[in-house]
Amino acid sequence: MSRRQGRETALQTLFMADVGRMEPAYALQYASEEFGISEAAAAFARELVEGAVANRETIDGNIRRLAKEWNLERMPHVDRNLLRVAIFEMLFREDIPLNAAINEAIELAKIYANEESAKFVNGILGQLARELREARGEKTSAQEGAPAAVTNRVTTPAPESTPVPDPDATPATTPVTTTVISETAANRETRSMAEEETQPPGVNEV
């Protein structure tokens, strides 16, 4: 559960930095405090945010290449930043299985966007996964001749880095709560029920 929370917080952070023009470091601190996540989840969120920011050129290049019918700047904010988080995981985190990164992104798309976004995210990430598997010589159902990924997956996590501030961003002095993504009441109720069903009685996550 801590990694799901970390991904949610990373999404919220990139969303606030993107829409609210907030410094990534400030947005991350605010999101972590706002959602009261565990230290493990906060650490994972920090890795995702810093990695996505540091490798944004490569990540966005892959999004533009794979989403040929979309202008990246006009893509829905949730979709764009979900893809940034997931593609960072897929390209730069060898310790995270490709399917795990994809499935988590799909679930977050369902929570914070809709089924259409989930299908869109699945299509983009599925294509990238096929390319990465082909580059490693793994079996895939994709046809031969698929274009190679812009950057092959590395074998070690990306080095830690300080989030790169947006030169055009206006530093916030108070929490900008209007830029936080809100899940729908239906999704919130569904997720709450699912968590209650999957959480063993008397067991709390450390």
Curated annotation (Swiss-Prot):
Assigned keywords, A-Z: RNA-binding, Transcription, Transcription antitermination, Transcription regulation
GO cellular component labels: cytosol
Residue ranges with Low complexity bias: 169-180
Domain of life from the UniProt record: Bacteria
InterPro entries found in the cross-reference section: NusB-like_sf (IPR035926), NusB_fam (IPR011605), NusB_RsmB_TIM44 (IPR006027)
Location of region: Disordered: 135-206
GO BP: DNA-templated transcription termination; transcription antitermination
One MF term in the entry's GO annotations: RNA binding
HAMAP family assigned: NusB
Function: Involved in transcription antitermination. Required for transcription of ribosomal RNA (rRNA) genes. Binds specifically to the boxA antiterminator sequence of the ribosomal RNA (rrn) operons.
NCBIfam families on file: nusB (TIGR01951)
Protein name: Transcription antitermination protein NusB
Species of origin: Heliobacterium modesticaldum (strain ATCC 51547 / Ice1)
Gene designation: nusB
